[in-house]
Structures are given as C-alpha cells and as structure tokens.
UniProtKB/Swiss-Prot annotation:
Chain segments annotated as coiled-coil in the UniProt record: none
Taxonomic lineage: Bacteria, Bacillati, Bacillota, Bacilli, Bacillales
GO cellular component terms given for this protein: cytoplasm
Gene source species: Bacillus amyloliquefaciens (strain Y2)
UniProt record similarity statement: Belongs to the Thoeris B TIR-like family.
Record carries keyword Cytoplasm: yes
Subunit structure, interactors included: Homodimer.
Record entry for activity regulation: Activated upon phage infection.
Keyword terms: Antiviral defense, Cytoplasm, Hydrolase, NAD
EC number(s) given by UniProt: 3.2.2.-
Gene Ontology molecular function: hydrolase activity
Gene: thsB
Protein name: Putative cyclic ADP-D-ribose synthase ThsB
C-alpha cells in the first residue's frame, strides 16, 4: 500500500458522469472540488494532495464492482482524511455512499466537511449557543451513511473559504496517523 498522505475529496456528481459539455460542472459540489484543485495549481504550497491523482481516471461506463469501486477504495486506502463537499445539491449516489461508508467505517478516516453554500462559521453554528444550525443538520440527511457514521471519526465542519479549508487540511487532529478522539463534532470558533 502507498503512503497515506492524500486528501480524498468526496463530492456528488450526477450519474452517469460526463466531463463533456457542462457534464460534471453542472454539479455544484464538483465545481467546489475543482476550485480546491485550482488553489493548489496556483500555489504549490497549498496543503491539498489530491488522492484522485493517485490512480488513473475511470469513466462511468466502467464496471462498478470490477473497476470503479476498487479504484475508489484504493484512493481511500492512500488517504489521510476525507474532504466532503456537502450542499443542498448533494445526492445520495452509489459512489458517494461507498466513499463515505468505506472511508469512515472501514478506514477510520477523519472528515473535513466543507459547505460550498456557506461562507461564514456563523452560517454553520449559532456562535452564542455553539449549536449547529438546523439547515446544516438537515444537510447531513442527504447522505444517511454520513449522518449515521460521522461520530465514529473526528469530523470538522467548515464554511467554503480558502483559508478555513487550508487550516483544516493542515490540522493534524484531522489526519489518520495523528487524529483526535472520535465521538464529537468540531468547528472553529466564531
């Protein structure tokens, strides 16, 4: 097995996946992932090491059991955490369920949840009561395996801001070999 130094980006793309025309770019979660890649492309020191680059690309026409699922798992096997883009556009697709289930329940990978539609910490939590906003809690139900499993690993919730994502990517508490205890959800204070 390779080094576990990658960041596995989990995001929804409509199925069947197609990069042609609008294709994947019509899916907001995929656009958010591509922005993360652009930040890395512009600044080589940006701490994103894309696990999707660790194996060759597969296309949606590939066999799920023989090609797609093993490829997702191999990428997760080489990852230190999951960056999960969760929005009102996220759907409970087969691939996303597999990524989250295998990543959390088998590999124990910490999760950095990024909310592409939220730009402030106060959009995620009530800064006075330190309680998650109902809009955020409702998003967790879009991928039930995530909602049911997130307390099994360290999970941090952050808005879609370059500096906040960078801070989470650099935070050793959310890396497989140095992770903090599971059972709580975390967020950076307001």
């Amino acid at each position: 097995m390779g080094y576990r130094n990658g960041n596995y980006a989990a995001f929804y793309v409509s199925e069947p996946f197609s990069e042609s025309s609008l294709g994947a770019n019509a899916t907001k979660d995929f656009v958010s992932y591509n922005m993360l890649r652009a930040w890395k492309g512009k600044d080589n020191n940006y701490p994103f090491n894309d696990s999707h680059d660790k194996t060759y690309n597969v296309r949606d026409g590939s066999d799920w059991e023989k090609t797609l699922k093993p490829r997702l798992r191999k990428r997760l096997d080489q990852s230190k955490n999951i960056i999960f883009f969760l929005s009102k556009h996220t759907e409970n697709s087969k691939a996303l369920r597999e990524e989250i289930d295998y990543g959390i329940n088998v590999k124990g990978l910490p999760v950095i949840v990024v909310y592409p539609e939220l730009s402030e910490k106060s959009d995620i939590i009530d800064c006075t009561t330190k309680v998650f906003r109902s809009e955020v809690v409702n998003l967790w139900s879009r991928v039930p395996v995530f909602k049911d499993s997130m307390l099994k690993v360290p999970t941090i919730h952050i808005p879609y801001k370059k500096d906040q994502i960078k801070k989470a990517l650099e935070n050793k508490d959310f890396m497989i070999n140095s992770k903090i205890s599971a059972g709580s959800v975390y967020f950076y204070p307001c």
